[in-house]
Amino acid sequence: MARQKLTFKEQMDGFPWVQLVVVSLVRFSEPIAFSSLFPYVYFMVRDFNIAPNDAQVSKYSGYLSSSFALCQVISAYHWGRFSEKHGRKITLTCGLIGTSVSLLILGFSRNFYQALVARSLMGLLNGNVGVIRTIIGEIATERKHQALAFSTMPLLFQFGAVVGPMIGGFLVFRDGTMNEVPLWFPHFAKRIIRSYPYALPNVVVCMFLMFGLTNATLFLEETHPAFKDRRDYGLEVGDFIKKNIFGIQPKRRPWQKRIQDDSENIHHRNENVNSIRGQDSEEDENSPLVNTTNDDDTESIQSIDPILTRRQSVGLIRTYSLHEPTDAVHANIDTAPDGCKESSIFHHVFHTKVFYPISVNFIMALHLIVYNEFLPVFLAYDLAVDPENPKKLASKFPWKISGGIGYEPEQTGTLLSTTGIFGCFVVIFIFPIVDRNFDCLTIFRTLVKLYPIMYVMVPYVVFLQNERIPSWYTVVYLYIITGIKTFCGALTSPQIMLLIHNSSPLSCRSVINGATISISASARFIGPLVWGYIMSWSQQNDVAWVSWWSLSLFCMVALYQSYKIAPIDDNENELHGQGSEDAYNSQSQSSDLRMAHRSSLSSLSNQRCTT
């Protein structure tokens, strides 16, 4: 089906800005927490005196990063299951609290093992990335809004990746450095900072997290179809604040409507009870009843005060209940051709159309984490020169490449932070234009082709380190490489999330998102381990291009897999989503009515007792 081109005004019509802003405040705080560690982790591990020498510090720093990713593999799927059973909002708040606790433990750690526990807890106690993806999909229900809504994820990560390193870099006050504690700090704060030099950045990041937690508690609406009508005391407090402080009239909540409707119907229900009681007085109360009640109805009847007769109780339940027998449903459990239950997550992930988007996402996560981790390492290697002629490079074009270009951390940090700002520009200004004119599969397939080219280019920056070549050539060359990566990442990340979202059944969408996060985390755990070995081997054998070219080949697998992803039919997707939503709403309404009539029965019994 041809993609209908929309104007910006048409695409923004009805866009759920308010709820998306609340979710964005939560999402923005999390990459700050994740990236604030990078500037000082080397010095923190070194100060723990766990490494036998400075050369081994990076290995122990890698353990901290790997423990986080490994624990995400373990926990993300279970957080998705938790959100399906208890709702998205409670899962989000638990994740924010868990991250805050783990950051405080990290900041006040006295040894390496405490820091390792803190990083592990950060991975275990937070599955918010997958839950936030689900929330965004349930907030942006119209196809024209989804791509722009999902694009907020990489945008906020880019912003957080700029702010986080600034906090971690400027708020660490270590002895023997130029970064000293400001004179205006209170005396007790100075004592704490001197004892725990890495605590302050973590405390500041916790403030960001608490701000996001407060906003989520007060203003975020539950998006799970089965729980969105459940009473939310946090929202009620938020509505009170909006009305009495900001003068904004909040909308009526579903549970407020239900309570009012119940109170209006009490009078009619009293009349029905009296009518049933009058009819029943003419019959023998010991006579057998027609055996048409199911177990749930029987349980409801038995829970009613004996002041109401059994026949009166049956009349009320039949009048107000939408409950239907479900024995047939439980007896008929479909089994897929793969031998798994059709409702199982294994079936949905590995034997349905969502498999290909998830597999592509795994490859993307792996090669991007390898790039992010090892590009600074490669640039930091000393420039290898010919022992016989120091003015010449030891590398020989095109196959013999050794060493790096001797970049300092400040140079690498400037390079990465600048391209991060460029990524924000891409998401804000370029992404909406691209999304309005092309479908997500076309965008994704086109941009994925650029990754292999970029990785092939990386090792050849060594040959620009020549006296006859101006130094700005190297800067431009590196900005081209990092710019391509940032441009492609900013535009492909929301597309693959959208493809996974729209390929997932609504009934287990949050669980699939949780499984996706676990699979991506496993990629971030495996990638650095494997390519760390490859990079070490290639440097020792003067073939540094092998590590980057192998990464390029791995990207081509993602390109191949992308052609197996089924295109999204916008009309079919919207109809399917609406139908599934209606099914959830129908179940929720049925449950609400059953609870309402049971509450009414209890009230009627109490009224009869008092009379």
Swiss-Prot record:
GO CC list: chloride channel complex; fungal-type vacuole membrane
Parts of the chain on the Cytoplasmic side: 111-152, 221-353, 435-442, 564-611
Region (Disordered), start-end ranges: 261-301
Subcellular locations according to the entry: Membrane
Reactions it catalyzes: chloride(in) = chloride(out)
A single MF term (Gene Ontology): chloride channel activity
InterPro entries in the cross-refs: MFS, MFS_dom, MFS_trans_sf
Membrane topology summary: Multi-pass membrane protein
Transmembrane segments: 90-110, 153-173, 200-220, 354-372, 414-434, 443-463, 543-563
Its job: Outward-rectifying chloride channel involved in chloride homeostasis.
Protein name: Major facilitator superfamily domain-containing protein YCR023C
